[in-house]
Amino acid sequence: MTYGCVLINVDNGKVTQVLEKIKRIEGVIDAFECFGRFDIVVLIQTNEVSELAMITAEINSIEGVGKTETLVAS
């Protein structure tokens, strides 16, 4: 099992839209808005690291997503 925590910066005014799209992605077990350096935290669970990479690529393709940082545990 592989777990990921994706920390996301989002363009101004886009947090709600981005969060709704992220929550629909298969493999995302939770996603929520936060305060501080990042705007959204996403928790992901997959069977393989390659699946985690595909999910993070999908997140990065969402309009309004800026910088991301992914933490991985397997």
Task: Please state what every model-predicted region is.
Residues 1-74:
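A compositional/biophysical signature of low hydrophobicity enriched in polar/charged and small residues
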